[in-house]
Design a protein with these regions (language model features):
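N-terminal leader/targeting segments
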Residues: 1-85, 90-92
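A generic alpha-helix surface/boundary motif
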Residues: 16, 211-213, 294
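Hydrophobic alpha-helical transmembrane segments in multi-pass membrane proteins
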Residues: 2, 11, 19, 52-55, ...
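Hydrophobic positions within alpha-helical membrane elements
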Residues: 24, 204, 266-269
């Protein structure tokens, strides 16, 4: 019992996790959540006002309830489908979208992850939100698209297919966990590039460097599968991985191997920590060394998309 009392944060994590799971599986209405938070806050204030041992259980119960409801509220808030301007709430097939990453070349198409910025409903331009996957018919115009570009599209979104086999990797669930619920295929005359690019310049630079590094890997005669694994390990670029490779690694429990992780960051930190040994001899060298290490680690995080 004493050990339990010495772990207050752990005790609060349990109702928080239960709240997240409750919202995921049952989707509690927002109004009920707010009512619950208000009741819990009143209970908490009452127990603080009484401030006697007799009412301590109310303080504990209300604290757990607040964390439980807070988890439900946060999970509800970050669900893109609960956004009042989500594209799925509008009846339209004309959209303005923004590329969230660089395009990815597939065997028969060009893939892009985009964010819906505007819907066009009855001639009116309405601000919108939500992410989708677009597949473009291959041509030179598509290959010029980069992160941050805005394009106009004319299409009807399609739901992502469920796996056909019971043991197959659930690509639909994987995308939904990342806030993506629809996809679309665009032939050449169903989209048009605008002159607008609202990408963040730091990310633009990081993606350009990653493109250059990927070109170096391509010039080393790797097979397509080897290139996809190498780009995931070294550059954090997992878009080149096909479903078969993802399924192979996930079924063997080794999917984490293909992700840039804290281990990579730790190795880079140690390498530069010892490379910058000469800074230790300077008067303010330790401060300069620390600043450089932070810049390098943050730069690597941007470079790999962490």
């Amino acid at each position: 019992m004493n050990d339990w009392n010495q772990l207050p944060l752990f005790r609060l994590i349990i109702p928080f996790i239960l709240g997240v799971l409750t919202e995921i599986f049952f989707s509690i209405q927002f109004n009920f959540i707010l009512i619950g938070v208000c009741i819990s806050a009143c209970m908490l204030l009452f127990s603080a006002w009484k401030n006697t041992f007799k009412w301590n259980f109310i303080f504990g119960a209300s604290t757990y309830l607040i964390f439980y409801l807070l988890a439900i509220l946060l999970t509800n808030t970050i669900n893109p489908l609960n956004d009042k301007v989500h594209y799925s709430l509008f009846e339209s097939k004309y959209y303005e979208v923004k590329l969230l990453e660089d395009i990815v070349e597939k065997p028969n198409s060009i893939k892009a992850e985009v964010e819906v910025k505007f819907c066009f409903v009855k001639g009116e331009k309405i601000q919108s939100s939500g992410k989708i996957i677009l597949y473009f018919q291959k041509n030179f115009a598509v290959e010029s698209l980069i992160y941050g570009d805005h394009i106009l599209i004319n299409t009807n979104f399609q739901e992502i297919d469920l796996p056909t086999n019971p043991s197959q990797f659930n690509y639909k669930q994987y995308l939904e966990n990342n806030g993506i619920f629809h996809q679309a295929y665009l032939i050449t005359d169903k989209w048009k590039k605008t002159n607008v690019n609202t990408g963040i310049w730091v990310k633009k630079l990081a993606l350009k460097l990653r493109r250059d590094a990927l070109d170096l890997l391509r010039n080393n005669s790797f097979s397509d599968k080897e290139l996809s694994v190498a780009s995931a390990l070294l550059l954090g670029k997992k878009d080149l991985l096909d479903r078969e490779t993802i399924l192979t690694y996930s079924s063997s429990g080794a999917m984490h191997v293909l992700a840039v992780s804290g281990l990579h960051v730790g190795i880079i930190y140690l390498a530069f920590f010892y490379l910058f040994f000469f800074f230790d001899k300077w008067k303010y060298g330790k401060y300069i060394k620390a600043i450089l290490l932070i810049i390098i680690l943050w730069g690597y995080a941007l470079f790999t998309g962490l």
